[in-house]
Amino acid sequence: MRTIQAKDVTRAVAQMCIKANCTLQDDVVSCLECARHEEPWPVAQATLDTILENVRIAKTDNVPLCQDTGMACVFVELGEDVNIEGGSLRAAIDEGVRRGYTDGYLRKSMVADPLRRENTKDNTPALVTFDVVSGDSLKIILAPKGAGSENMGMLKMLKPADGVGGVKDFVLEAVRHAGPNPCPPIVVGVGIGGNFDHVASLAKRALVRPLSQPNPDPFYAALEGELLDAINALGTGPAGFGGKTTALAVHIEQMPTHIACLPVAVNINCHVARHEEVVL
């Protein structure tokens, strides 16, 4: 059994909150630069130039990439041989979010109740997904998720007979419906399988995969490529001004499901596809 101090979790989460909001991951920056190089439309080129300049300024001045510093979405992989000492793991994560958003002067966007709408004033609670795994390490992935892209998510319970074609049609429908609202170029997370609640989590988890890393299953990797081509053929373009770069990547995560089910969920990230990871 390995012991990890709750205060170390808090410290790591606080640091990730600030870094994720101010420094875009290298893989995302590389995709944006590649899109700028390949984009023939002058307005789209200028839009991508502005996006890349914003990325540079945010990193240099350590200021947020976007005014919407998001909900703190956290994925936790807790080793079976790990003991958290000095407090609960969830409380340690929330305290890290509280400190990170306060010390980093990041906008607090969480309301305590969806209808009463009173701001919690510290961006807690974090939205945490726990997964117990083998081993003696603790992995934490933090992804600040803004509302502009989150509000464009869609979920549908397809019929098994709808098959691959039905999945493609639904994903394209979701992206077409989103239009410029999620601040393209976007990253599209697609969950397939499980049940109503699990498929949405799959779609969100797909968004934290490195953009250069396709699905390990060749069948789904090919489907990711087909969907990316189809989405970019829509012509929405950067910021919705037109162009060939509507999406930077499509990521699919799949899991077993019931013989009578074919759940599909789409979760979209804007071009500020923020996330950080730490292993303790």
Task: Give residue ranges: language-model regions.
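Non-transmembrane, aqueous-exposed alpha-helical and coiled segments at domain scale
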Residues: M1-L280
